[in-house]
From Swiss-Prot:
The gene is dtxR. Keywords: Cytoplasm, DNA-binding, Iron, Repressor, Transcription, Transcription regulation. GO terms for biological process: negative regulation of DNA-templated transcription. One of its GO terms (molecular function) is protein dimerization activity. Pfam families: DtxR (PF18357), Fe_dep_repr_C (PF02742), Fe_dep_repress (PF01325). It comes from Corynebacterium glutamicum (strain ATCC 13032 / DSM 20300 / JCM 1318 / BCRC 11384 / CCUG 27702 / LMG 3730 / NBRC 12168 / NCIMB 10025 / NRRL B-2784 / 534). This is Diphtheria toxin repressor. GO terms for cellular component: cytoplasm. Its main location: cytoplasm. Homodimer.
Amino acid sequence: MKDLVDTTEMYLRTIYELEEEGIVPLRARIAERLEQSGPTVSQTVARMERDGLVHVSPDRSLEMTPEGRSLAIAVMRKHRLAERLLTDIIGLDIHKVHDEACRWEHVMSDEVERRLVEVLDDVHRSPFGNPIPGLGEIGLDQADEPDSGVRAIDLPLGENLKARIVQLNEILQVDLEQFQALTDAGVEIGTEVDIINEQGRVVITHNGSSVELIDDLAHAVRVEKVEG
């Protein structure tokens, strides 16, 4: 499977992202994420199914085979290690990190990946708080970590809560307008905020600045409640 094209890796990573966000991975969701037509996605998924990487379930959701999941984990691991390098060492503008890492994930050699694990201070989570998967496969002892916190969209309706931002999933990173609004408000990983889940939207407030996220993006923010 060494000759797999980047399109296949992008599809597998997208399915992995959807699973992380608690969204059923359907071909329609991939079309939305990758801005591709329905027929193009269907053709690519059919090829991936023939290659033994995914299985289309009776409910039309996509399930990765063990081989497909292994490749998805490898791609996501390189992606998030690249994000750490770009942020911690190169100092790239945080708004450009995700797109740049999307390029690096397809070309990073295994040797470079292992070297990154040695030189980076934090290889367990990306700069956006997302767990870096499959570190044991490259020689780093690590127990599997469950996703921390709760999705903002799953918070009790109508309650104004104190919370700490712990994860910003990929779909929010590519919505530069919303991502910029959050960073302009001083919201980043570890920031304590006021947050309220209203019907159809989530409002995050920090230092007097409020950012409204619709449901489609609110599921991409994970928080931990802060007592007191």
